[in-house]
């Protein structure tokens, strides 16, 4: 199964922001790179009371076992760009040349959250999705499976038509043309130590699936 993920946003809250005097953008179409995203997010955070939110981003869940959005999904972005620059698809030595870009978006999440940075270690993904569903936050990083989480929250205030996606911008040159992240994290593997007959049967089974 191929997954897609990015920054989920509540369009109702965004439209409310765009209508404010002095808004840093007039529509989501203008938010097509990190610089503009940062400008808008920081302005929204400053005007959170007017928008009726507790913070722009839902909690960056850092409870042990709940950090997969950052150590896998978000980390895929700098790794992708490093691989792209080197023309490779695998490596034994990751240089993390786009670490500053990773830090850009991670800091934006943490510093413009509905939860104080020092408390993020106590937050789970469920907490994060509940904050978004209850209208406490305007944005949350998650994937195309997110609606079931949002809709499953008791008291959900977000309409299905207001759940929309924005690419995860990090400040990489040319990111205006970047789309949502897509990929798969799980693979079937065949043991090379198995007999040739068993390997062939396994391949046939996977192809049948």
Where in the sequence are the language-model features?
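Extracytoplasmic/periplasmic substrate-recognition and gating elements
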Residues: 154-209
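Glycine-centered hinge/linker elements that transmit conformational signals in sensory
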Residues: 38-45, 81, 85-122
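A structural signal for short loop-to-beta-strand junctions that line the ligand-binding cleft
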Residues: 1-14, 174-181
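Paired acidic/hydrophobic, glycine-rich loop segments that form the ligand-binding mouth/hinge
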Residues: 138-142
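Short helix-initiation/N-cap motifs at beta->coil->alpha
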Residues: 31-36, 119-134
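Short helix-loop capping/hinge motifs at secondary-structure junctions, enriched
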Residues: 13-25, 47, 115, 194-202
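Extracytoplasmic/periplasmic solute-binding protein
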Residues: 1, 5, 35-91, 137
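Short, solvent-exposed loop/beta-turn-alpha elements that line the ligand-binding surface or hinge
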Residues: 16, 26-30, 61-64, 79-104, ...
